[in-house]
């Protein structure tokens, strides 16, 4: 099984309507199965959505997915027992939502207004099993490992990562993929962030930690192929999940 994944590294404006229109334009003119957009893309990082925006935007995106035979993964703030930093995986028939578990409250990041999520989100689509996480979550290996042990093939890691975090993000992504023999689809914001800027660098890491596709520090849409066959080959080479000592409690 193969899927064409579009890394949609585009700047989010403070106008949610414009962001949605741009998303729709990209989906209509790009040949891909899955379109991944950054953390909080619909509102922009630090922005907000008009009341009821998602009530119409999500069905609109579902209609687009039906028209194009694709899925869209996109970030947006959601009011649900507090404000959530959420990532949606939208298909013609289903809507899956993940709420960011680990909120960034340091440096230039201002996420004190959000309420942290409490659970993981995993689902199947077109013959592959997906999990989601958001930005700072990737620093916590338990998330990738939990998804992998539950049978995930791909972990989508949307982000709004600015300059100071780049050195850490570029180290951790390949490690998460390799130690769990899964694809990691990392999709970062681009453009200004206060006195700094989002650095882009969106990429796909293969199940052996190798980079399959990478964006530069500007706006772009890059399409790359992921496959279950490559995951199977990787797990024949590296037996990390098979050899994991699940009989040990791992508490000191």
Q: Language-model features: where?
A:
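Active-site-proximal beta-strand elements of phosphoester/diester hydrolases
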Residues: 2-14, 97-99, 129-137, 156
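Short, flexible loop segments at the rims of nucleotide/cofactor-binding pockets, characterized by
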Residues: 11-15, 49-53, 108-112, 131-135, ...
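Cys-nucleophile CN-hydrolase/nitrilase-fold catalytic domain and related Cys-dependent amidase chemistry
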Residues: 13-16, 24-91, 96-97, 163-182
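Short, acidic/polar
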Residues: 17-27, 139-145
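CN hydrolase (nitrilase-like) catalytic-core segments centered on the catalytic cysteine
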Residues: 56-73, 139-220
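Active-site catalytic loop in hydrolytic enzyme cores
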Residues: 79-150, 165-171, 233-240
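C-terminal beta-strand edge segments of enzyme domains
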Residues: 122, 189-252
């Amino acid at each position: 099984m193969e899927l064409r994944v579009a890394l949609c590294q585009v700047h989010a404006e403070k106008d949610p309507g414009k962001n949605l229109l741009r998303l729709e334009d990209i989906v209509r003119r790009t040949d891909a199965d899955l379109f991944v957009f950054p953390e909080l893309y619909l509102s922009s990082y630090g922005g907000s959505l008009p009341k009821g925006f998602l009530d119409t935007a999500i069905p609109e995106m579902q209609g687009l997915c039906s028209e194009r035979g694709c899925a869209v993964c996109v970030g947006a703030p959601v009011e649900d027992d507090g404000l959530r930093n959420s990532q949606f995986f939208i298909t013609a028939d289903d809507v899956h939502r993940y709420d960011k578990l680990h909120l960034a409250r340091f440096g230039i990041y201002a996420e004190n207004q959000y309420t942290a999520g409490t659970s993981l989100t995993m689902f199947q689509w077109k013959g592959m099993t997906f999990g989601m996480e958001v930005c700072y979550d990737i620093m916590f290996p338990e998330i990738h490992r939990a998804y992998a042990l539950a049978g995930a093939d791909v972990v989508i890691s949307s982000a709004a990562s600015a300059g100071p975090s780049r050195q850490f993000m570029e180290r951790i992504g390949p490690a998460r993929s390799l130690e769990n023999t899964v694809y990691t689809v990392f999709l970062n914001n681009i453009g200004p962030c206060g006195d700094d800027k989002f650095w882009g660098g969106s990429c796909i890491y293969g199940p052996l930690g190798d980079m399959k596709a990478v964006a530069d520090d500007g706006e772009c849409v890059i399409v790359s192929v992921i496959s279950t066959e490559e995951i199977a080959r990787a797990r024949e080479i590296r037996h990390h999940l098979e050899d994991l000592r699940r009989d040990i409690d791992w508490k000191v």
